[in-house]
Regions:
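Short, surface-exposed alpha-helical recognition segments that flank or form part
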Residues: 1, 100-103, 149
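N-terminal secretory signal peptides that target proteins for export/translocation
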Residues: 1-25
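Sec-dependent signal peptide recognition
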Residues: 25-34
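Hydrophobic h-region of N-terminal signal peptides that target proteins for export
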Residues: 34-41
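Class I SAM-dependent transferase core
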Residues: 41-125, 136, 141, 156, ...
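Conserved nucleotide-cofactor-binding alpha/beta core module
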Residues: 117-236
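Positively charged
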Residues: 255-256
Length: 256
């Protein structure tokens, strides 16, 4: 009798333990499903915001290049801003990304991309990586993007982010962008995302014949002109496109 009681008690304990494990497993599965649904809904929400951004901010203002529109429809801008700014990633304006720098207004990103008239086989140099967003947009269109960022923390963060998101055709370098990237030149197009007092000659020298460069030019801490420079038979022509505000072109400090 005592043996039977012990066996029954042990069996009851086993059943109880198994029941608890089943309950815990169900709770875990439920939690995972809820998390997956939450992430899915969040992604769907960002996808909708991105599509609305393209329609209301880009197409409505005259952006027509299909490659540019497609790139900005697919690049997750919210993943290129600080986490506490992600809800605002698709607003019609620039956003701070730290170190006194900003991610440009979506329309400006699209406009600068469109005027370069990029093709799939192009090699592009970007000066001023920032968050890496503009490089990601370019990477959706061309074969190779080389981008230089003078602020070390931003360069590292952008490099890691672009790698994590699968932009394998972007190469990030920490350094002074004024002198360009001679080892990777010449380039079909150059984009400068910081305001300079004048167009750096080394960048013009690194343009291919028929190449185009877009750069904000003007006095420090003032409204600048977005300038399109074209190179043909070693001659440079420039055209002012619009008035803009950009963070200043930062140079490497000279050692005394």
């Amino acid at each position: 009798m005592i043996w039977n009681t012990l066996v029954m008690d042990r069996s009851e304990q086993v059943r109880t333990t198994l029941g608890q494990m089943v309950t815990m497993a169900k709770q875990l599965v439920s939690a995972i499903l809820c998390l997956a649904l939450s992430i899915g809904f969040a992604q769907d929400d960002y996808t909708t915001k991105r599509e609305q951004m393209v329609k209301s901010q880009l197409q409505a203002r005259g952006i027509k290049d299909l490659a540019t529109l497609d790139a900005m429809t697919n690049v997750p801008r919210h993943l290129f801003v600080p986490e506490n700014m992600q809800e605002h990633a698709y607003i019609d304006g620039p956003l701070p990304i730290g170190n006194g720098q900003t991610i440009s207004q979506p329309y400006i990103v699209a406009f600068m991309t469109e005027v370069l008239q990029l093709k799939s086989g192009d090699r592009v140099l970007e000066i001023g990586t920032g968050s890496g967003y503009q490089a990601a947009v370019l990477a959706k269109i061309v074969d190779s993007v080389y981008t230089i960022e003078i602020i070390k923390d931003l360069a590292k963060t952008a490099k890691d982010r672009l790698k994590e998101l699968g932009y394998t055709n972007v190469t990030v370098k920490w350094g002074d962008g004024y002198h360009g990237w001679p080892a990777k030149a010449p380039f079909n197009a150059i984009m400068v995302t910081a305001g300079a007092d004048s167009i750096p000659r080394p960048l013009l020298d690194q343009l291919k014949d028929g190449g185009r460069m877009i750069i904000p030019v003007g006095p420090y801490n003032a409204i600048r002109q977005l300038v399109l420079a074209k190179k043909k038979k070693n001659k440079i022509t420039t055209q002012n496109l619009m008035a803009v505000r950009f963070v200043p072109f930062t140079r490497e400090k000279k050692q005394d």
